[in-house]
Amino acid sequence: MAARLCARCLPPAWLCRQAGQGQSRHYRAAVCTELKQPLTIQEVAPRPIGPQEVRVDVHFCGINFADNLVCRGQYQEKPPLPFTPGMEFSGVVLEAGADVSTVKKGDRVIGVSNFHSMAEQCITDQKTLWRIPENVSLQDAAVLPVSYGTAILAVDHRARIQPGETVLVTAAAGATGLAVIDVATNVFCAKVIAAAGSDEKCKLAMQRGAQSGVNYSQGSLKDAVKKLVGSSGVNVAIDMVGGDVFLDSLRSLAWEGRIVVLGFAGGNIASVPSNLLLLKNISAMGLYWGRYQHQDFAVFSKSMSTALQYCQQGLIHPHTGAVFKLEKVNDAFLHVMQRKSTGKVLLSLK
C-alpha cells in the first residue's frame, strides 16, 4: 500500500499549497528517503506550477545506471533527501504555465528532469520538453533521451563518423550501446563491431545492426578485433566499460583513429597511455551528454529533436529490454545493476 508523504518530510518546492486551477489529486512516486536503501512508493501532494513550467502525466520513465548511483550517494549530483529519481520520461501534458509557448495541454512529449520523473506526474521547464511525432509511440519515445541523445552526440558531434568507417562499440547490448549501433549503422552507414560480455548479448547487437560481435569475457578484445579487421584497426571506438576493455579498444584503433569515452560500467577507470595517442595520431575524447544541457543547450536540444526526427522517419528503432510497473521499481533497479538488462529498462506508470 502506498504511504502518504507528509509535508513536513518534503523539500519546500514539494509542499502542497492551496489547490489552484489545473492542480490535481495526490499522485504516486518512487521516493528515496535513505541512501543505499530500497525506494518506497509514496503519495505526493502536487504543487502549483510556475509560469515557465509544465505538468506532465508520466506514462513511461527510463531507468539509468545514474539513477542507482544517485540513490546510493555515489553520483556527482547529490539531491537532498527525500527525493524521487528518474531523469527521462514520456507522457501527456496536463497543465502549462502562463508563459509556456512550446507545448499545450494534451500534447504528447518526452522530457528530461533533474531526478524526479519516477512518478505519475512530473513538473519540468518547458525548454526540456519535446513534442512526440504522431507515428512514434510513447514507449519508443521514452527510450530516446539519454540513450539516443548520447549516441547521436557520440557518433556525429564527437567522433564525426563517416560512411564506411569501422566502429567498435563496447557494452554493445546495453541501452546506449544498442542506440550507438542503431545510429552508426542506419543513419551514418558505418560498419560496427559489437563487443559485449556474453554470446547472447553479441547476438542481440548483431540482430540490431552490428556486422560482427566479440565476446570479451572469453579472451583478448584486441586480438579478436585484429582477426576481424587485420592490423589496420578500427576507425572509431566508443567505450562504456573502462579498464582493460578501454585499453584494448584504444590499442585496436587505426591511424588517426578516435576513441570516445561514455562511461565506466566495469568500475575501473583506466589511465590513457599517451604514447599510443602519439604513435598513431589518435584522438581521445569524452562525452557526458547531460552536461550539454548546461554548457551548450543548443547542442543538447538538437540531439533530442534529431532523435525524434530519425524515429519519425523510421531510420532508428528504439529497443526496450524490459518494462516494470512502478510498484516493482526496486526489482527494476536490481535488473539493471545485475547486468541482466539489454536495451532500455522502463517503468510504466499506467
UniProtKB/Swiss-Prot annotation:
Family of this protein: Belongs to the zinc-containing alcohol dehydrogenase family. Quinone oxidoreductase subfamily.
Protein name: Quinone oxidoreductase-like protein 2
Record keywords, A-Z: Acetylation, Oxidoreductase
PANTHER family: QUINONE OXIDOREDUCTASE-LIKE PROTEIN 2, SHORT-CHAIN DEHYDROGENASE/REDUCTASE
Pfam families, alphabetized: ADH_N, ADH_zinc_N
EC code: 1.-.-.-
Keyword ATP-binding: no
MF GO annotations: oxidoreductase activity
Origin: domain of life: Eukaryota
Residues modified to N6-acetyllysine: 36, 302, 328
Residues recorded with modification N6-succinyllysine: 201
